[in-house]
């Protein structure tokens, strides 16, 4: 609709222009006919008519519509292509044509919206073209002289980079151009002692880097603190030194042997090397040995309470045999003092109360079932008694009531007895014989004599007298009652100690042994069968 209106308007303007042009031509032709032109003047020599040369035009605003130069300048100004000639022509038009000045203001208003100010529109030559080019690169078009840089270009802060103008590939972090490692290095070098703890590195970050100032709380600081710990641990630039105080954090310093520049990550120690594997195994063995020693010490304390500290010596011996290497000596430095050295253990003392004995032929009895009383502690025979068996004598003199009585051996009808075994054979079977309850006490040989009745002590004296036969029978044994009682005691000593001991060993009292109090007959029979080895067993009833 607007296009049709413009077309009709143009048509009316054209008709008016043609009418006025025809009238002007007629008037000009009439004037020229009145004053003919000189013969030396041609149409090529004539200068173009100017509005200020005295020629008057009766034009209005509609005449500017057909000015082609004006339309060309307006079209060029709309696209920013103002040339030096067109700019000069516009200034000349502004000086003498009030109608064209209105149209120029319209063009300037359009350029103002494009470039931002009238001052920028007045620039000539290449400045305007540069401004239009800058507008295409600048999103907001606010500054026509600002040069747009690529997004990955880093604005260098050092003067060397500014002069050289070279492009770097360092990634720009949120806090600046420095990496975590560079920030940590700066923090350590800024400290007076050139060393910082991990907490001090955190504090320096919060105080000196603006990006971390509002991220110092526990919720928002977990990420960057974790990155700092990783950089300290993985980069060879940093080195950890143990703090002198107990329970304090380690110091972090700059490694003087590190290479300058971007340092590679620290290579972790491989745990599968021979040296590290050997050390790890030795340390593990030491810990295991200590643990086993403590457990055995606890068990030994329990057994010692029940059996008279009988297992403590064997624990020390076993622990010494398990780790006999010199490298394992450090594992036993902290062993409790209750463990005695091996030379003082119960195994080396024959007369101790321990049931632990040399394992001579002990494998024979591993599969046998022994009665419950066999496991009880059995006091061993003192070594000095065994060693002094050669001092035993037949003719022994006993002291009874301060009276020295010489014991004479009397012939007793007994069966022939085999000679006793040697000391080494006796010692080899002593462990098995000591466990047999029938062999614990000396066997008293059976005799044919009967104890003689005392005169006046029984029924013969009650009848009022003593018959000659009874008196004779009694008098043959002992003429006096006092002497008879002494003889009975002497006979008992003779039977009990058929082979008398030395005088300093006669009064030795051995511990009482439980004989038949809690005896299991079935277990005893099985034990005797296992000891006999298929031979006949005889029990003396």
Swiss-Prot record:
Please give the residue ranges the record annotates as the region Disordered: 118-168, 252-291
Q: How is it modified after translation?
A: Phosphorylated by akt-1 and/or akt-2. Phosphorylated by sgk-1. Phosphorylated by unc-43. Phosphorylated by jnk-1. Dephosphorylated by tax-6 in vitro. Ubiquitinated. Ubiquitination by rle-1 leads to proteasome-mediated degradation.
Gene Ontology CC terms, in alphabetical order? cytoplasm; cytosol; nucleus
Q: InterPro entries this protein is in?
A: Fork_head_dom, TF_fork_head_CS_2, WH-like_DNA-bd_sf, WH_DNA-bd_sf
Record keywords: Cytoplasm, Developmental protein, DNA-binding, Growth regulation, Immunity, Innate immunity, Nucleus, Phosphoprotein, Repressor, Stress response, Transcription, Transcription regulation, Ubl conjugation
Phosphothreonine PTM positions read 273
Which ranges of the sequence are annotated as binding DNA?
175-268
GO term, biological process aspect, one: regulation of gene expression
Q: Which GO molecular function terms does the record list?
A: 14-3-3 protein binding; beta-catenin binding; DEAD/H-box RNA helicase binding; DNA-binding transcription activator activity, RNA polymerase II-specific; DNA-binding transcription factor activity; DNA-binding transcription factor activity, RNA polymerase II-specific; DNA-binding transcription factor binding; enzyme binding
Induction of synthesis: Induced by quinic acid.
Polar residues composition-biased segments: 118-150
Q: Where in the cell is it found?
A: Nucleus; Cytoplasm
Effect seen on changing residue 319 to A: Prevents phosphorylation and results in cytoplasmic localization in unc-43 n498 gain-of-function or tax-6 mutant backgrounds
Does the record bear 4Fe-4S in its keywords? Answer: no
Family annotation (PANTHER family): FORKHEAD BOX PROTEIN O
Q: Tell me, what does this protein do in biology? A: Forkhead-type transcription factor. Binds to the promoters of genes that contain the daf-16/FOXO binding element (DBE), TTGTTTAC, in their regulatory region. Functions in the Insulin/IGF-1-like signaling (IIS) mediated pathway which affects lipogenesis, lifespan, starvation survival, heat shock and oxidative stress responses, sleep, associative memory, and dauer formation. Longevity signaling predominantly arises from expression in the intestine. Acts in the intestine to mediate the role of slo-1 in age-associated decline in motor activity and longevity.
What name does UniProt use for this protein? Answer: Forkhead box protein O
Organism this protein belongs to: Caenorhabditis elegans
């Amino acid at each position: 609709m607007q296009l049709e209106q413009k077309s009709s308007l143009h048509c009316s303007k054209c008709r008016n222009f043609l009418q006025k042009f025809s009238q002007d031509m007629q008037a000009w032709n009439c004037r020229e006919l009145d004053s003919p032109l000189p013969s030396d003047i041609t149409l090529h020599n004539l200068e173009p008519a100017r509005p200020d040369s005295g020629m008057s035009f009766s034009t209005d605003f509609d005449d500017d519509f057909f000015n082609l130069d004006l339309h060309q300048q307006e079209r060029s100004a709309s696209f920013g292509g103002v040339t030096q000639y067109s700019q000069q022509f516009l200034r000349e038009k502004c000086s003498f044509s009030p109608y064209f000045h209105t149209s120029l203001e319209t063009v300037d208003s359009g350029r103002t919206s494009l470039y931002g100010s009238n001052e920028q529109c007045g620039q000539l030559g290449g400045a305007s073209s540069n401004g239009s080019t800058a507008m295409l690169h600048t999103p907001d078009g606010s500054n026509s002289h600002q040069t747009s840089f690529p997004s990955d270009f880093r604005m260098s802060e050092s003067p060397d980079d500014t002069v050289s103008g070279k492009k770097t590939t360092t990634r720009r972090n949120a806090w600046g151009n420095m990496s975590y490692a560079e920030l940590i290095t700066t923090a350590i070098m800024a400290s007076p002692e050139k060393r910082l703890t991990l907490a001090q590195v955190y504090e320096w970050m919060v105080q000196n880097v603006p990006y971390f100032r509002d991220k110092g709380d526990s919720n928002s600081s977990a990420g960057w603190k974790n990155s700092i710990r990783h950089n300290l641990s993985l980069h060879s630039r940093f080195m950890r030194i143990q703090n002198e105080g107990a329970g304090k954090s380690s110091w972090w310093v700059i490694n003087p042997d590190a290479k300058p520049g971007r340092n590679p990550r620290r290579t972790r120690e491989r745990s599968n090397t021979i040296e590290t594997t050997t050390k790890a195994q030795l340390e593990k063995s030491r810990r295991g040995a200590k643990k086993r020693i403590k457990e055995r010490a606890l068990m030994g304390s329990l057994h010692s309470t029940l059996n008279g500290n009988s297992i403590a010596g064997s624990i020390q011996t076993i622990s010494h045999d398990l780790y006999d290497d010199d490298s394992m000596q450090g594992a036993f430095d902290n062993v409790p003092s209750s463990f005695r050295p091996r030379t003082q253990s119960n195994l080396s003392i024959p007369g101790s109360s321990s049931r632990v004995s040399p394992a001579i032929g002990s494998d024979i009895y591993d599969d046998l079932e022994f009665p419950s009383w066999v496991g009880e502690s059995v006091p061993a025979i003192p070594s000095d008694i065994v060693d002094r068996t050669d001092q035993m004598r037949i003719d022994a003199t006993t002291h009874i009531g301060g009276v020295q009585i010489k014991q004479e051996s009397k012939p007793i009808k007994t069966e022939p007895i085999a000679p006793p075994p040697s000391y080494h054979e006796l010692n080899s079977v002593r462990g098995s014989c000591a466990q047999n309850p029938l062999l614990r006490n000396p066997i008293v040989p059976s005799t044919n004599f009967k104890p003689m009745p005392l005169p006046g002590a029984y029924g013969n004296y009650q009848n009022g007298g003593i018959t000659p036969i009874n008196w004779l029978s009694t008098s043959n044994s002992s003429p006096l009652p006092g002497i008879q009682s002494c003889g009975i005691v002497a006979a008992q000593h003779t039977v009990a100690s058929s082979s008398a001991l030395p005088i300093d060993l006669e009064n030795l009292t051995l511990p009482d042994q439980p004989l038949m109090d809690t005896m299991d007959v079935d277990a005893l029979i099985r034990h005797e069968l296992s000891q006999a080895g298929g031979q006949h067993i005889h029990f003396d009833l």
